[in-house]
């Protein structure tokens, strides 16, 4: 109803339950937010009758982690061994089925999907964020407890993926992708 009332030219869907530890405590809410929330946005897009450019964001955790050193590709399996990853994989599958069933045949809709990994910056002081936890512990002269200490975590400043999302939206709008 809101999308129909506002009639936006662009939709950027970045909403998510993004904390892995929370997904263990609140698995149903994580799936509801990440999968059903994405389906709700897609349902709103499916009912758009005007020209609209849409960018949906999931996560690099959408891929089934096979513990290799290379980046994942579009052809790699989605999934996950935990609720957060599984919810992001399920969101990707939901996007794909809406695309193939409805949106692909809608010439008025331009749709792109992007995935980012671990981001830092922008005032993110959420619980169970490694950089945040380190800063808080160091400021209190406390020992830092690292979850999954053998994991490799590539980082990017939040402005990098945001710039990419805006560029993707612009390129979709201009018909360059």
Kindly give the residue locations of the regions a language model identified.
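Catalytic helix-loop patch of NAD(P)-dependent Rossmann-fold dehydrogenases
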Residues: 25-43, 52-53, 62-119, 124-126
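NAD(P)H-binding glycine-rich loop region in Rossmannoid oxidoreductase-like domains
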Residues: 1-33
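Residues in well-ordered alpha-helical elements
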Residues: 9, 21, 28, 39, ...
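Substrate-binding strand-loop-helix patch
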Residues: 33, 120-128, 149-163, 177
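SDR active-site strand-loop-helix element
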Residues: 11-17, 54-59, 114-116
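Alpha-helical substrate-binding/gating segment
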Residues: 103, 132-145, 155-177
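CheY-like receiver
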Residues: 2-6, 44, 137, 164
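Alpha-helical elements of Rossmann-like donor-binding domains used by nucleotide-donor carbohydrate transfer enzymes
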Residues: 10, 40, 93-97, 133, ...
């Amino acid at each position: 109803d809101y999308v129909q009332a506002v009639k936006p030219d662009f939709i950027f869907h970045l909403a998510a339950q993004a904390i892995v530890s929370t997904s263990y405590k609140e698995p149903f809410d994580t799936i509801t937010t990440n999968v059903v929330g994405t389906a709700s946005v897609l349902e709103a897009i499916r009912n758009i009758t005007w020209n609209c450019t849409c960018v949906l964001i999931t996560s690099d955790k959408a891929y089934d982690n096979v513990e290799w050193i290379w980046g994942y590709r579009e052809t790699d399996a989605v999934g996950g061994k935990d609720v957060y990853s599984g919810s992001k994989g399920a969101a990707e599958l939901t996007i794909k089925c809406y695309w193939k069933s409805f949106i692909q045949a809608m010439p008025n809709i331009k749709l792109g999907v992007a995935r980012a990994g671990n981001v830092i910056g922008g005032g993110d002081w959420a619980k169970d964020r490694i950089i945040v936890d380190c800063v808080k512990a160091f400021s209190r002269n406390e020992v830092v407890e690292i979850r999954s200490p053998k994991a490799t975590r590539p980082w990017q400043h939040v402005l990098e993926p945001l710039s990419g999302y805006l560029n993707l939206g612009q390129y979709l709008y201009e018909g360059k992708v």
